[in-house]
Amino acid sequence: MPSKDPILTPELLKIIKIFGAASILLVVVFSFFDSYRANNSGEDRTFRMTSASRLYFLNLKAINYVRENRSDAGMVLYRHNGFGLESEEETLILVLILNSQKDESYLYLEPKNIDWPIRLSFEENGQTRLLNFENGNKFDHLEQVTELQKLLEEEVKLFLLDEDQKIPLWSSESEKDAVKFTFEDYFRIIEN
């Protein structure tokens, strides 16, 4: 004969209530930390661009750039109109590169009418300092342009050294604007 013992005893109900309340409390507490997700993919997101930022650039900002399709590399190069692209002077041009196959964007320091390595000079605290930039990979170029960006934010006057000639770099107002807008557009594309 089956026993008539109650299955849900008061002690069991207390235990169920405690574990139920604790689990709900844990869910609520962990929901506050939901915004941070670990990136376990092993993928480097340094140069990653989102579709929204790419479309913003293409629809609103790309009109200020000269576009060059590089179908062999699957990339599109953008050079700002303010750099005076038709000029024959020695200078540096910031090239914004969109690689839509990898959803990545790069910023390249392109020498015009000079060769690598690029040598720059500037004055800081009354002393002339030199920068030497070598042609390298995308990480090297990002490091170089961020170093240049920091100097330009400090409003340091840069000079390009070519065979002991000191050529003012980005001295015209249109070139300064081109550098500024290229930096702004690039860092908006990669959202860094």
How would you label these PLM feature ranges?
Residues 2-143, 147, 161-192:
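A generic "folded-domain core" signal
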Residues 152-163:
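Short, aromatic- and glycine-rich surface loops/edge beta-strands on solvent-exposed regions
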